[in-house]
A protein has these predicted regions:
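Active-site HxH/HxHxD metal-binding segment of metal-dependent hydrolases
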Residues: 1-38, 120-123
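Hydrophobic alpha-helical positions that pack around
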Residues: 45
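Metallo-beta-lactamase
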Residues: 3, 39, 50-129
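Short gly/pro-enriched beta-turn/loop segments at secondary-structure junctions
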Residues: 28, 49-50
């Protein structure tokens, strides 16, 4: 918990509606967070949930994607506040803009470069085609 780690709780407002604790900050698209000299940029990527976000560290070419996108598939959209249409929009308007040398780190499973994602993730490629 935040008390144990002595750090602020940051979450999107949409996802906070299911969170039992108190948020210190609601994350918005484009927010910038300074983490000991590393600049983190928030990108809203609804689809898995309406409040899904990815955290981009441009200096290290790293993206923490949570359950939005994985090396070979996308996050589930069959939850109460998930949306396949929003996932498609997130893939087209946000994720597809990340350079090939950026490495994604999902909430679980393997990391991958965006070049690998563009090669092996058929669900992502399908979103770009529809």
């Amino acid at each position: 918990t935040a008390e144990c780690l002595k750090c602020p709780v940051m979450i999107s407002f949409e996802d906070s509606l299911q969170y039992r604790g108190k948020a210190d900050k609601y994350l918005e698209d484009g927010d910038i967070i300074d983490l000991d000299g590393e600049t983190l940029k928030i990108a809203k990527t609804p689809g898995h949930t309406m409040g899904s976000v990815c955290i981009i560290a441009e200096e290290s070419k790293t993206v923490f994607t949570g359950d939005t996108i994985f090396d070979t598939d996308l996050g589930r959209t069959d939850f109460k506040d998930g949306s396949e249409a929003e996932m498609i929009r997130s893939c087209r308007e946000v994720i597809d803009k990340w350079p090939n040398d950026y490495r994604i780190y999902p909430g679980h499973d393997e990391s991958a470069t965006m070049k690998q994602v563009r090669t092996y993730n058929s669900e992502f490629l399908h979103c770009l085609e529809v």
